[in-house]
Structures are given as structure tokens and as C-alpha cells.
Amino acid sequence: MMTFRLMLLAATMMVPRMAQSQTNDDFVKGADVGFLTAQEQRGVRFHDREGHERDCLELLRNDYQIGAIRMRVWVDPRGGSCDKHELLAMGRRAKALGMQLMVDFHYADSWADPSQQPIPAAWQGHSFKQMKRDLREHTIDVLTLLKENGITPRWVQVGNETANGLLWPMGHIKENPRQYAGFIRAGYDAVKKVFPEALVIVHLDRGHKQSLYDWNLDIVKKYGGRFDMVGMSLYPYWAMRDHPELDADSIISDCIRNIRHVSRKYGCDVMIVETGFETNEEHPEVMARGWQQLARIIREARNDTEGRCRGVFYWEPQCLPGYHHYHLGAFDSKGAPTIIMNGFIDALMQPLR
């Protein structure tokens, strides 16, 4: 068993520039960087492990094999954060670096997740038919802006962590399952109208919970919803907070098993579109475990899913500890990558012995 001290020595001796040799397969390593614009506007500067100031996206791309970014987009956000213009600007930066783009439609003016799926203010009081039109027009408007500026997303999410539906209560999955599926279909059709080759993703949380995926996706299929790919969130940290009896290893194993199950049952590819691990600068052993777990997830998602998992995205790796009260980023308080980021590097993605 490799000791913790030897693990750290191996990590610090690793020259990140070696990561520039990309894998030959089509497996994607990605990063959701929705906070990045706001961070840069607030003066946050990023550095590599040697202390050299670097552009954040360039650092992710060249040192850690991050080949794609994921960007959320809100309908009418207060202050303009995460709007279509910010999406376009980040899309241009990614394209200049040869990175691919995933667009994550929240269909809300702010955060949408399993605990909240608020209807945008401008859509309030609309009928189901009108709200489907709203969703369709918003999707087409955002994607057309990208297309007119030469940006082509490879993947588009129609909703964010829609385990319980979206646009509540109109599209709540328990109260109105048919309408939930109708919104998914409206989003799918809108994406295909602008970008026929884009892969449309239905995204759910708790990737380790097979029963959730069976229940939700069966409803989507039953009532005419369509998707090309299933996106999963995988957060051992949050799963263990909610269920202390669980452990990270079993959660990861259950997710890998669920990827195989979902791909077989629904005949589609799968991606882990969100994951993250605790950054605790006072306890480096916590971050070392995060490195091991991220490396394991990437390794097994690529090698042990019958070729059906197409990638892993880290949610806000460039997030400094405590930014927006979040502690699952992978950079330290000085804006430099922690050991967690080494999970992306092929040379360190072998089982520790």
C-alpha cells in the first residue's frame, strides 16, 4: 500500500506539462467553469503548481487534459451572470483553445436543482402550451446566438438535475409527469432545430441510485420525451452527508454499475457531468483521497462501462475554497491546483498499491 507521504511525493514530482499528450480515444475530461467569469471580474488570478500566473482555461487544457467546458445558462439572471452573452464569451475562449462545449440549460432565472426548479419570472402564469413555447424559444434563441458566432456545442442539457422534474409545479414529475416529459421533448426538438448533430442530455443527480434513473427516465420515455444521452451527478461527499452509513468506494461502484445499467436499458451513452471532492488545506490527506477517488472514477468510467460512459466533468474545479460557500473545488486559496487535479493526469490513473 502506497503511504500517504509517498503519494504526495509522487504527485509533486509529476510534471503537469506531461499531461499534454491526450488519450487516443474519445473519452472526454471536462470542467464546469460557470463561476470563472465572475471570479476573474473580482480579480482572482490563477497559477500553476510552480507559481506561474496562467489563464485558467489554458491551465486546465494544457496541464490537466481538460478537453471540454460546461456552462450553465439562465433565462433572465439578475446582474447578467450566466446569461447567453457570458456563455458566448466563454464558448469563444474554449474554441480558441480547441476545447469542446457543453451547454447546461437550467430553464430558470437562477439555480435549478432537485430542491428547486423555479419558473422564470417572464414565464409566470403561462399555460403548459405557452410554457413549452417559452422553453423552445429560449433554447433556440441562445443556441442561435452561438451558431451565428461560429460556436457549435457538442452536448446540450435540457434541464439541470431534473430528478423531480422542472418548471415547478407545471413540470413536477410527481404531480405532472406528462408535462415534465413534454418539456424535455420541447427542449430536445429545439436543440435539434439549431444543431441537429448536438447530443441532447437529460441530467439527474445521485448517479449511484439506480432506482431514481429507472423511475425518471421511464416517465420521460412513456410520455414521449427524447434524449440522446444521460448525464449523471456523482458526489460521494454529499451522498455521505445525506446517508452517513454509505462510503465513497461503494458510492462510486454503484455509479459505475448504474452507468452500465442505464446504457443497456435505454440504449444510450452516459456521462458523469458533475463531480467534486473536498478541498481542505489544513488536512492534505483529505485532498489526497479526493485525488484517488477522481482518478478511480475517470479510470473506471472509461474502462469498465462497456464503452458507454463518454466522459467525466468536474464541477467548478477552479473554485477557491469557500467561494460561494463551496468547498468541493480543486484549487487552493492562492488560485493554484491542488493534488485533486492530478486525478485527471493519465500517468497517475493507475491503482495505488
Functional labels for PLM-detected ranges:
Residues 83-88, 113-227, 240-257, 281-294, ...:
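Active-site cleft segment of glycoside hydrolase catalytic domains centered on the general acid/base Glu
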Residues 23-25, 55-65, 89-100, 144-151, ...:
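Acidic (Asp/Glu)-rich catalytic clusters
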